[in-house]
Amino acid sequence: IMFVLEKIPLGVTSMIVCIGLVVTGVLDVKTAFAGFIDSNVILFVSMFIVGGALFETGMANKIGGIVTKFAKTERMLIIAIMVIVGLMSGVLSNTGTAAVLIPVVIGIAAKSGYKRSRLLMPLVFAAAMGGNLSLIGAPGNLIAQSALQEIDMKFGFFEYAIVGLPILIVGILFYATIGYKLLPNHDVKDEGAFDTEKDFSDVPAWKQWLSLIILVLTLLAMIFEDKIGIKLCISGGIGALLLILTGVISEKDALKSIDLKTIFLFGGTLSLAAALQETGAGELIANKVIGTLGENPSPYILTFVVFILCCILTNFMSNTA
């Protein structure tokens, strides 16, 4: 209920969950807070820093500007925006990608005379769809990974793309055809905080290119995890450390790029999952759900029910929660 209502910040709710489980004796301190030292949390923190360097140096801004520059019409511009945002969201923060490119798109809209609302809506949808391209594309992907690791299974780095890439392609095609006619044809009257595009002219070019090189090398290490024998979280940690040690990003900016709400929410969710498993409540809930679908429910029907339930809940609460 607290996750749905969000009367209390989600990060605080997660801490209440952890502390409450200890106070009530459901879990011991070590188990209740084990989620915060999970390997996937370390991966989260590392990739927030690696991705943050691309934003802080202006390299993400530059990539977005170069791609959109080649679009000659509004329709082509929408396609270009969705392609670059979708691909970047697959390996970087969805929110960060959108936040960095929104001022770029607003600037393009002002220069070209296009309505900003017609460009921003496809951008936001592309950021959401792009998160399904890789294991690190969205927090929910790593939560599922943590659940699988409990039974010695895991997703491949780009395994989500089997479903995510077709969704992104269909989304782009939709906005290039039918959706193009449905886009809002009005402009925003209020001047928002995103109107001012950040100036990166004083950032040395070597920092921009090194941030991109380290990101690419980090991703390659993750893709070939099994061959090189280095875990995802370690590859991410090495990339984050290199960025700080080489001076590409300062310690202050590195810490600023970490989304603490996501980290607390992730850790608290893992603790809650541990409590459900320890007490048998998880099995009880699962049996009740399966029982409502009959003695031997089809896995397709069960998946459909869970899918619809998630689709409904995500309209009222955080996707990650």
For each of these PLM feature ranges, what is it?
Residues 1-8, 84-93, 125-136, 221-227, ...:
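Transmembrane alpha-helix interface/packing and boundary motifs in multi-pass membrane proteins
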Residues 1-45, 49, 162-287, 303:
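Hydrophobic transmembrane alpha-helices of multi-pass small-molecule transporters
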Residues 3, 27-31, 87, 128-131, ...:
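Residue-level signal for pocket-adjacent positions within structured domains
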Residues 7-10, 94, 138, 157, ...:
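Conformational gate/switch positions in structured elements
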Residues 10, 29, 55, 134-135, ...:
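Short, electropositive, low-hydrophobicity segments enriched in small/polar residues
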Residues 11-12, 16-19, 23-115, 257-262, ...:
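Membrane-embedded alpha-helical segments and adjacent helix-loop junctions characteristic
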Residues 76, 112-125, 130-143, 147-201:
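Juxtamembrane and boundary regions of transmembrane helices in multi-pass small-molecule transporters
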